[in-house]
Design a protein with these regions (language model features):
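Short alpha-helical hairpin
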Residues: 2-20
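N-terminal glycine-rich anion-binding loops that anchor highly charged ligand groups
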Residues: 11, 33-34, 53-57
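Active-site flanking loop/helix segments enriched in acidic
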Residues: 15-34, 67-72
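Alpha-helix boundary/capping segments in eukaryotic regulatory proteins
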Residues: 28, 48-56, 72-80, 99
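An active-site-proximal "capping" alpha-helix that borders the catalytic cofactor pocket
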Residues: 38, 79-94
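Internal catalytic or translocation cores that form aromatic/hydrophobic pockets or channels
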Residues: 89, 93-108, 118-122
Length: 213
């Protein structure tokens, strides 16, 4: 469902229609609606910040950002962010999108759970993270009007238990490869769900390396 919020909408193109269809068919309704909301929050953030970006590519980055959590795109040993980025890369390459744009979308997905870095990079990279941080963490909640938030949620519902359901979805998507959470926020997800989880400690890795000193 495409809506127009203060001039922001999903571009009606063959590329975006295919993206919508692929994500709807591959991801759960929870992830599909989450990713759709991420696009609107990201695009509105871009509007407020006066950033220039390609709306089709932003839509791709937002919609594919959690595809690494799906069975179809989840690898055995890569971070889920990389899996999603690789899925987007394969899709865009099949449509002969230029390599620079593919690389930008790849980075926007790969870095979307890395706080403090994306906002200093290409607008598309910054905005995918901005959308995710708004929908999952609510970090910029006051920056959107009640009307904007409600319109987005009406079109793409959060449901009554989104907070717990998204944490569970994260866990289900990464529990088979907990080693990929070293040094990133998803270690908190594993720890929340698995009391036996013993995350790698950065200082311990240093001290236990094969170096003599």
């Amino acid at each position: 469902m495409s809506i127009n919020i203060d001039g922001i909408s999903i571009p009606d193109t063959a590329l975006t229609r295919e993206i919508t269809e692929i994500v709807r068919d591959t991801a759960s309704p929870l992830l599909f609606h989450h990713s759709s909301r991420v696009y609107y929050f990201a695009a509105l953030a871009g509007q407020k910040r006066g950033l220039t970006y390609d709306a089709e590519l932003l839509y791709c980055g937002c919609m594919f950002h959690d595809m690494g959590l799906t069975h179809q795109h989840s690898s055995a040993c890569e971070r889920f962010e990389v899996d999603g980025a690789n899925a987007a890369k394969t899709f865009l390459a099949s449509h002969r999108i230029n390599q620079q744009d593919i690389d930008t979308v790849w980075a926007s997905i790969a870095l979307h759970t890395t706080p403090g870095i994306p906002q200093h990079m290409h607008p598309l990279i910054a905005l995918v993270t901005a959308g995710v941080e708004m929908d999952v963490l609510g970090l910029t909640y006051p920056e959107y009007s009640d009307e904007q938030r409600q319109a987005i949620v009406n079109a793409h519902p959060r449901g009554n238990r989104f907070k717990e359901e998204i944490i569970q979805a994260f866990y289900e998507g990464i529990k088979h490869k907990p080693q990929t959470t070293f040094g990133n926020v998803k270690a908190d997800v594993i720890a929340d769900k698995d009391p036996q989880f013993a995350p790698l400690n950065f200082c311990s890795v240093i001290r236990n390396s094969q170096w003599d000193s």
